[in-house]
Amino acid sequence: MNRPERLQPGVKLRDADKVSRIPVKIVPSERDTMLRKPDWLRVKLPASNQRILEIKQALRKNGLHSVCEEASCPNLAECFNHGTATFMILGAICTRRCPFCDVAHGRPLKPDAEEPVKLAQTIRDMKLKYVVITSVDRDDLRDGGAQHFADCIREIRKLNPDIKIETLVPDFRGRIDAALDILSTEPPDVFNHNLETAPMHYRKARPGANYQWSLDLLKRFKERHPNVPTKSGLMMGLGETNEEIAQVLRDLRAHNVEMLTLGQYLQPSKFHLPVERYVPPAEFDELKALADELGFTHAACGPLVRSSYHADLQAQGKEVK
């Protein structure tokens, strides 16, 4: 039996190379079998791309990454033109192979010790008032990257004292308590961790993750920081039923999660999980009504909603869909 080829540090694996060794094998989609994208998912492009170019140049100049680009978010043009970006720390290579996600897999490089300062300076130069900080999974690090998150928050606040910071964190697999000890030294203004889908779809969509661990992470953070809102996001279109999603919403509320995002899954390439259905806007409206009934303080539900889509407006309790 041949051993898998050892990954080289810093090499990005995408598409077929990325998903070649996950538990549920994916058959590449043929064009004639892919569902046609409905009109309600068509994205309007901004009249000018000047602000988009400015943000991209600022990121390149400082060697920073945005999840908007790395994960091929459909809202990139709108958010960049609005002057917002979700920064992705700890590199652009993830140690996991989730087949819904377009972020590259591989063996990451050592964290950049200068990244927290460069990030803080970039945010100051961009005159941002609300930022979202996320990361790839770093299962190679003893703390899962928690200290780097804390360092980034500290440096950002040094140079930007009036800023609001939302963190979208990984699950810190097997290191939850240690990670929370570290994160508690520099708590964010909003703590976000995405469940992504219903538990019965984890094996195919989130190999290496655990539904209950993710719920526990959200609950334990809230127990330590009762005044910091907790938030989670889900995708639809992976084969789940609306009742399965409804149960996830109940589970989130049972674990004291207050904010919700719910959007449509879009297949990044033919090598990723296929879209099993496009969920009509009316069904998102029904799930939002349920979320409101369950007591979420804010629920952004719509086909193009993403976890950090207009996160500043979400945090202010304004309608986003």
Curated annotation (Swiss-Prot):
Annotated residues that bind [4Fe-4S] cluster 1 are located at: 68, 73, 79, 308
Please provide, alphabetically and separated by semicolons, the GO molecular function terms listed in this UniProt record: 4 iron, 4 sulfur cluster binding; lipoate synthase activity; metal ion binding
How is its cofactor bound, per UniProt? Binds 2 [4Fe-4S] clusters per subunit. One cluster is coordinated with 3 cysteines and an exchangeable S-adenosyl-L-methionine.
Q: Where, by residue number, does [4Fe-4S] cluster 2 bind?
A: 94, 98, 101
Keywords of the record, alphabetical order, are: 4Fe-4S, Cytoplasm, Iron, Iron-sulfur, Metal-binding, S-adenosyl-L-methionine, Transferase
* Domain of life the protein comes from: Bacteria
- Cofactor or coenzyme needed: [4Fe-4S] cluster
- GO CC annotations? cytoplasm
The answer to whether UniProt assigns keyword Membrane to this entry is no
What Gene3D superfamilies does the database record attribute to this sequence?
A: Aldolase class I (3.20.20.70)
Catalysed reactions, as listed in the record: [[Fe-S] cluster scaffold protein carrying a second [4Fe-4S](2+) cluster] + N(6)-octanoyl-L-lysyl-[protein] + 2 oxidized [2Fe-2S]-[ferredoxin] + 2 S-adenosyl-L-methionine + 4 H(+) = [[Fe-S] cluster scaffold protein] + N(6)-[(R)-dihydrolipoyl]-L-lysyl-[protein] + 4 Fe(3+) + 2 hydrogen sulfide + 2 5'-deoxyadenosine + 2 L-methionine + 2 reduced [2Fe-2S]-[ferredoxin]
Q: In which pathway does it act?
A: Protein modification; protein lipoylation via endogenous pathway; protein N(6)-(lipoyl)lysine from octanoyl-[acyl-carrier-protein]: step 2/2
Indicate the enzyme's highest-level EC class.
transferase
Keyword Iron-sulfur on this protein?
yes
Please name the NCBIfam families in this protein's record: lipA, PRK05481.1, PRK12928.1
Instruction: Report the sequence similarity comment from the record.
Output: Belongs to the radical SAM superfamily. Lipoyl synthase family.
The molecule here is called Lipoyl synthase
Identify the species of origin: Shewanella baltica (strain OS155 / ATCC BAA-1091)
Question: Which gene name does the record give?
Answer: lipA
